[in-house]
From Swiss-Prot:
Changing residue 273 to N: Strongly decreased hyaluronidase activity. Its cofactor is Ca(2+). Residues 1-76 are annotated as: Disordered. It holds the Pfam family G8. InterPro entries: CEMIP/CEMIP2, CEMIP_beta-hel_dom, CEMIP_X, G8_domain, ILEI/PANDER_dom, Pectin_lyase_fold/virulence, TMEM2_PANDER-like. This is Cell surface hyaluronidase. Its EC number is 3.2.1.35. Residues 1-82 are cytoplasmic. The modification Phosphoserine is found at residues 10, 53, 63. The lineage of its organism: Eukaryota, Metazoa, Chordata, Craniata, Vertebrata. Optimum pH is 6-7. Changing residue 286 to N: Strongly decreased hyaluronidase activity.
Length: 1383
């Protein structure tokens, strides 16, 4: 609608009468109003037209004809005008419709797309680094081209949107020092329902030593203040997956090959396996000098099997003695055309295929002149392995500057193909990916670049670079060790612009590169923040608060905080970061999902102050987490000792106890949720739960209603940890919450050992305990601990540990558990000592050695002497049950045991530790080991070492039911019928056992000597816990209903406390304590409440006149002092019940206090006088049981496989393939399917057809082909294998030729296999329109077997064409939904 203005001016547009220029109340930035015409103006029916005659009356006279003629004329004119208007209107309508349809067909507006908001104006600020931009109310900008500015502030309704187009062809880079989004401001790149298609890059530039910092945010940042909106949504892509097939170093299963030598005279020959690219034979034939060498070459070629690849290169000269028969053999079998005319010192190279004819032969010759051939004679052929990997074989020969050179290469051609677990069709050529280490060193992670690969399936990619390390892509020994593969590239990039090297005050003594990157910081009360599928590169600074993504003191960011759309980060790629990945600081309820953190400094996923709760970390990947400088816990050893600004005085930090804790997931409060995450390589720990005594940092002073130490654990489900040095999972410790001072000079926030996790209902210690459930943890290739878990009630279940220095260690406390009555349990779990993941030397792997199982070289967790343990007993009480142990075999250098104990243990070990329903595989040589003096164990003489013990409840460890296992030299627990197991350094005894906790006052460096009356020649000397302390403590394990005497290596203590620990009601022992003859005593007993330190029911012990009186009334409170021997005798008898796992009775800890008065300073050792007077003949209180026979029913975990995709079903398949010698010995051949053995002893081939869509598995057919019938297998393969079937084949004995190569190719191999003269053949294939990554062919040379092979095959996959009757239950998704609900 418009009105006519002055003549010659354009029409002036007017506002519609029903509209206005302001936003509607429901306007949402980024939501676009659909394109449609404005409504017509309202019809004002009440308006009146005034007759012109009323203003200027006039009279005109016409004849009737004249009057009629103008009337008719006007009527015709109106009709004409009506037609013209109609025509124009119609034409305009169709033109407009065509335009609209044309526009719609090109780029249909979408109200979900922020860049299609019709109110936006295109904006091009140009390239001006001095321009300060303020986008304010009324400024609604669409950035359409590259720009460089100084800074951008968006405020008061201002809006900045990155332009996009339908085909994603825009490529917009915005360079700025910072972007500050203030109240009412918004920055949008894409939206959740309209993801950005083009490439958008925000580059944050500037140096740390130029210009002043902005308040709060500093430099090089995107900052979101209260009321600000940041919405970044890139193209949705698979963030990370895992390998589905092992990626070998160099891309080939047997590695690449390279050889070069000068003056290697004659014909140098290599024979290469056409199926695997393995160099089989390496020979040199001096056909220049010797005719016999020519004959030997002829026979050598005659013996080669058809299809073998042969490479030949001349060294120096080869023709003088080259016989015609040999030349003919080369022509006939390799198709050479140049060998016949080869001359003196001519360079010649050939690559051909035996019996492949001239079409498969590539050869080259160069003439020799003046000691040179003027270049290389180069021959090359390209081939494919059975896995479909393309490789090349190269041979070359030349003379250069008078030197003869010849050589060979076998390597990858046209890129390496990766087989992945998930659909990665959204990954594109040019993208960067990272493949995680599957060895001890996190530095074996590799960055690779994707190539175009039209032949790849949806789960395959091809990479440009040659892998340097082995990356496992299999389930090995029942444990998922498949390497994580993460996509680093995103189409929205936020990056820091970096200098070439470190400068200014940026810790250049530790880093030789620039670490002053950009950062994104979000402040409290933001309006909306959602980041998805964004790449953050070169972000973070080695300065506090400057992290790639930092939610800073935001409080509750979910519905509890009033957000209808809770804040989230999803699908981010944070890599090459200079300070952390995602920092959650004083923020609760944040969802962090599908995010990768790679190659970062300091804790990666970082919960900071100990107040962060309800945050959800779902399916995130962190790897290559390196030390940083910010906090003591970030630092490595050198940083720790050098950075001393935060300590008091001249204190030098101790790296192992103050620092060295950098972790991929740093969880500072237990009430957070971790589901489906992978911590795939950190300098110290993968996942670390720590417990703050009080809020720290900027949250200091907040009053938490619930103490973290007492708060129940959030969801922990299906997380994996590997390639970490200190621990995969670490649940223990806290940080120091006080400033450095003279009394404690350590730095604020350094590691602190005072925290104890003891979860209770509502975080109230007076309410019932709540067990922390660690469900489905996979921990492998961690140098020290797979998992170290300290706390109250904790249950580890459905978990797997492999190739760790120590699989799992539970800890509670040194003397008494902090959480009285608590215990720890591991159940339904698998422990593997040395798996078939042999590792790969390199990438900072420090330790190599020989394996105990098969004596093959392998990487080791520590040095060659380090004792490997599966489950490590420490403190207690713990319960190990329903678990399986495999492959713990010592070597001459080291011990390896399924169950072991903490080494150099000065603390207590309770006899209430117990084991039941455990299973040991055939390759377990040491079920348990108690240590011996030597490397790592040192003298093995600390108090905890000597008192190591556990209860074998059902005999599943020892074969003796209801017995206790202790160290062999411990005579406090023995009786005559105990069974010694020398190789365990153990003794197995029946009986009942408890502990006496002895504490003395003012007696530093005093050792206690305790002797059982039955074994006076075998006393136990205890140094005491904290021996240098004023009040040392001792805690021997004792057999009940026996007598003991206690002596000292110095003057007797004046005050001694004896606590009855783990005594049930009426349990007793008699003790005699050594004192000088002139000592007087006051002995009392009471019940100590350890929670508050109160003492109740105090009674005095009365003196007895004789030993006989004392013995007749053992239940009364009496003592007897034998001044002749110096022994004060009394009975320690429990008078109250003990509940559950409580160390003390339900009334408190029964404590006897002895006050001794004497002026003697003599050493109080009464051994010589006490015995033989008080000697007793050794006897058993409880009869030793008979040894069990038969298999342990119900022992071990019922799970055969532990994977990171537990919603999938995997079928364990095991082949036992003996060679000729084993067959002659009578060993059977076996195919085992899910534990069911199919055995055969006749020569031939066994074929099993398994339904790929049935769970549980179903064998459709079992078919045996004897040697005479093997020729019929081809026909069977062609006609009888139904679709959607798994094909399992194993041969036995000599089969000269299997005619099934073509059939195996149809069942999943990339080409027909070479099956001539094989000792054994094992094949796993699939019948269907899909080639799974698990299809494999194994062969061995003639007369050799393949040993034991194990594979785990997925069942009921959609790719197989299975029609599932019901949807797969995803417990992880159920738990995610549960966590998202705010209570």
């Amino acid at each position: 609608m418009y009105a006519a203005g002055s003549r010659g001016h354009s029409p002036a547009f007017l506002q519609p009468q029903n509209g206005n220029g302001h936003r509607s109340p429901g306007y949402v930035p980024g939501k676009v109003v659909p394109l449609r015409p404005a409504p017509p103006p309202k019809n004002h029916a009440s308006a009146k037209l005034t007759s012109r005659s009323q203003d200027a009356p006039a009279t005109f006279a016409f004849s009737p004809e004249e009057q009629r003629t103008p009337s008719e004329s006007r009527k015709r004119k109106r009709h004409k005008n009506t037609f013209i208007c109609f025509a124009i209107t119609s034409f305009s309508f169709f033109v407009a419709l065509a335009v609209i349809l044309g526009i719609s067909s090109k780029y249909a507006p979408d109200e979900n797309c922020p860049d299609q908001n019709p109110r936006l104006r295109n904006w091009d600020p140009g390239q001006d680094s001095a321009k300060h931009i303020v986008i304010k109310e009324g400024d609604l900008f669409r950035l359409t081209s590259d720009a460089t500015v100084d800074s951008i502030v968006i405020q008061d309704g201002g809006l900045l949107v990155f332009g996009d187009d339908k085909d994603g062809s825009k490529n917009i880079t915005l360079r700025t020092r910072y972007i500050l989004i203030q109240d009412g401001g918004a920055l949008h790149i894409g939206a959740e329902k309209c993801r950005y298609r083009s490439k958008a890059t925000i580059t944050l530039y500037g140096k740390s030593d130029e210009r002043e910092s902005m308040p709060i945010f500093g430099k090089k940042f995107i900052g979101v203040e209260a009321g600000g909106t940041l919405e970044l949504h890139g193209a949705q892509r698979t963030s990370w997956t895992m390998l589905a097939r092992t990626l070998h170093s160099s891309g080939l299963p047997f590695g690449s090959y390279a050889f070069e030598k000068d003056f290697s005279r004659g014909l140098n020959v290599r024979v290469i396996d056409q199926d695997t690219a393995r160099v089989l034979e390496n020979e040199k034939f001096d056909t220049h000098e010797y005719h016999n060498e020519s004959r030997r070459l002829q026979e050598f070629l005659r013996a080669q099997e058809p299809g073998r690849i042969v490479a030949i290169a001349v060294g120096d000269s080869a023709v003088k003695s080259l016989l015609q028969g040999t030349i003919q053999m080369i022509q006939d079998r390799l198709g050479s055309k140049l060998i016949q005319g080869l001359g003196y010192r001519q360079a010649w190279a050939l690559v051909g295929v035996i019996d492949g004819g001239s079409s498969s032969c590539n050869e080259s010759v160069r003439n020799y002149e003046n000691h040179s051939t003027g270049g290389k004679a180069l021959a090359q052929g390209e081939f494919y392995t059975l896995d479909g990997q393309k490789f090349s074989v190269t041979a070359y020969s030349e003379w250069s500057q008078g030197i003869s050179l010849s050589g060979f290469r076998v390597d990858i051609a046209d890129g390496v193909k990766l087989h992945l677990l998930d659909d990665v069709s959204t990954w594109e050529a040019g993208d960067r990916i990272v493949v995680a280490s599957t060895d001890y060193s996190m530095y074996q992670a590799e960055e690779l670049t994707l190539l175009r690969c039209p032949e790849c399936s949806r789960s395959q990619v091809k990479v440009k670079e040659i892998p340097q390390y082995l990356h496992v892509g299999e389930i090995i020994d029942g444990i998922d060790m498949r390497a994580e593969v993460g996509l680093l590239t995103r189409n929205i990039v936020i990056q820091g612009e970096m200098e070439d090297s470190c400068y200014a005050e940026n810790h250049c003594q530790f880093f030789d590169y620039d670490t002053f990157g950009g950062h994104v910081m979000i402040e409290k009360n933001f309006t909306s923040v959602h980041l998805s599928y964004v790449e953050l590169k070169h972000m973070g600074q080695q300065h506090m608060g400057r992290y790639p993504v930092h939610f800073h003191l935001c409080g509750d960011v979910d519905s509890k905080g009033g957000y209808s759309q809770p804040a989230s980060v999803d699908g981010l790629s944070v890599h090459h970061s200079f300070s952390r990945c995602i920092t959650v600081h004083g923020t609760s309820g944040l969802l962090i999902k599908d995010t990768i953190g790679f190659d970062t400094l300091g804790h990666c996923f970082f919960l900071e102050d100990g107040v962060e709760q309800r945050n959800i970390l779902y399916h995130n990947l962190g790897l290559l987490t390196k030390p940083g400088t910010l906090l003591p816990t970030d630092r490595n050893s050198s940083m720790c000792t050098v950075m001393r600004d935060g300590v008091f005085g001249n204190y030098v930090p101790v790296p192992t106890t103050d620092c060295m804790a950098v972790s991929t997931f740093w969880i500072a409060h237990p009430n957070n949720h971790l589901i489906n995450n992978a911590a795939a390589g950190s300098q110290d720990a993968g996942i670390w739960y720590l417990f703050h005594k009080e809020p720290t940092g900027e949250s200091s002073g907040l009053q938490l209603l619930e103490k973290p130490e007492l708060t129940p654990l959030g969801i922990f489900y299906n997380n994996r940890v590997h390639s970490n040095f200190k621990a995969g999972l670490f649940v223990d410790k806290g940080v120091k919450t006080t400033n450095a001072s003279a009394s404690d000079p350590r730095e604020y926030l350094c590691l602190d050992n005072s925290a104890r996790f003891r979860p209770h209902q509502d975080a109230d210690p007076e309410k019932p305990r709540v067990a922390a459930i660690i469900d489905r943890l996979i921990a492998f290739k961690n140098n020290d601990n797979g998992a170290w878990v300290r706390g109250g009630d904790i249950i580890v279940q459905n978990s797997a540990f492999a190739d760790n220095g120590k699989g799992l260690t539970f800890a509670s406390d040194g003397s008494f558990p902090s959480d009285e009555g608590s215990s720890q349990e591991v159940t339904e779990s698998l422990f593997v000592g040395e798996s078939r993941n042999y590792g790969f030397q390199g990438g900072q792997n420090k330790y190599m050695g020989t394996g105990g199982i098969d004596q093959k070289p392998r990487t080791l967790p520590r040095n060659r002497t380090f004792p490997i343990r599966g489950f490590q007993i420490y403190d207690g009480p713990i319960h190990l049950t329903k678990s399986t142990f495999k492959k713990y075999v010592p070597t001459p250098d080291r011990y390896s045991s399924a169950i072991g104990f903490l080494m150099k243990n000065s603390w207590q070990t309770t006899p209430r530790n117990n084991v039941s329903l455990v299973k040991f595989g055939p390759q377990v040589s040491l079920n348990v080991f108690f240590g011996k003096p030597g490397p790592w164990f040192e003298d093995c003489e600390l108090d905890g070492d000597k008192n190591s013990i556990f209860h074998d409840i059902d005999g599943s460890v020892t074969g003796y039911k209801d017995t206790y296992v202790g160290r062999m030299d411990n005579y406090l627990i023995r009786h005559p019928n105990c069974v010694n197991v020398t190789k365990w350094n153990a003794v197995i005894c029946s009986g009942t056992y408890a502990q006496v906790y002895v504490q003395t006052w003012n007696t530093p460096n005093l050792s206690m000597i305790i002797t059982r009356d039955e074994y006076p020649s075998h006393p136990m000397v205890l140094r005491g816990i904290n021996q240098r302390a004023i009040s040392p403590q001792y805690q021997p394990v004792v057999m009940l209903e026996k007598g003991y005497t206690i002596h000292w290596n110095g003057p007797a203590p004046r005050t001694t406390f004896l606590y009855l620990v783990n005594f049930n009601k009426d349990d007793w022992i008699r003790v005699g304590l050594c004192y000088p003859a002139n000592t007087s005593f006051q002995v009392t007993v009471g019940f100590l409440q350890r929670q508050n330190g109160s003492l109740s029911r105090i009674e005095d012990y009365e003196p007895a006149r004789s030993m006989e009186e004392l013995q007749k009334k053992p239940s009364e409170r009496k003592f007897y002092f034998d001044s002749g021997t110096g022994l004060l005798f009394l009975y320690l008898r429990a008078h109250s019940h003990r509940d559950g796992h409580s160390y003390c009775s339900s009334q408190g800890c029964e404590r006897v206090k002895i006050q001794a008065a004497t002026d003697s300073k003599d050493i109080s050792n009464c051994m010589a006088k006490a015995y033989p007077q008080y000697y007793k003949k050794p006897s058993a209180v409880k009869r030793m049981p008979a040894m069990l026979t038969g298999l342990c029913q119900g022992c071990g975990t019922h799970q055969m496989v532990f994977t990171s995709d537990p919603h999938k079903s995997y079928l364990p398949v095991r082949f036992q393939s003996p060679g000729k010698a084993e067959i002659q010995r009578g060993d059977p051949s076996i195919i085992s399917v899910n534990g069911t053995d199919f055995t055969f002893r006749s020569a031939g081939a066994l074929l099993l057809i398994v339904d790929a869509c049935s769970v549980p598995f179903r064998v459709k057919e079992k078919r045996m082909f004897l040697s005479a019938d093997v020729s019929h297998m081809e026909e069977y393969f062609k006609a009888s294998i139904p679709p959607r079937s798994i094909v399992l084949l194993s041969t036995r004995g000599e089969i000269k030729q299997l005619n099934i190569s073509d059939s195996l190719a149809v069942l999943g191999l990339a080409k027909p296999a070479h099956l001539y003269s094989k000792g054994s053949v094992v094949f796993l294939g699939f019948s269907g329109n899909f080639a799974p990554s698990w299809t494999k062919l194994f062969t061995s040379p003639d007369e050799q077997g393949l040993g034991v092979l194990e594979q785990f095959l997925p069942l009921q996959m959609e790719e197989y064409g299975c029609s599932r009757t019901g949807s797969v239950h995803r417990r992880d998704l159920d738990l995610l939904q549960q966590a998202l609900k705010v209570l």
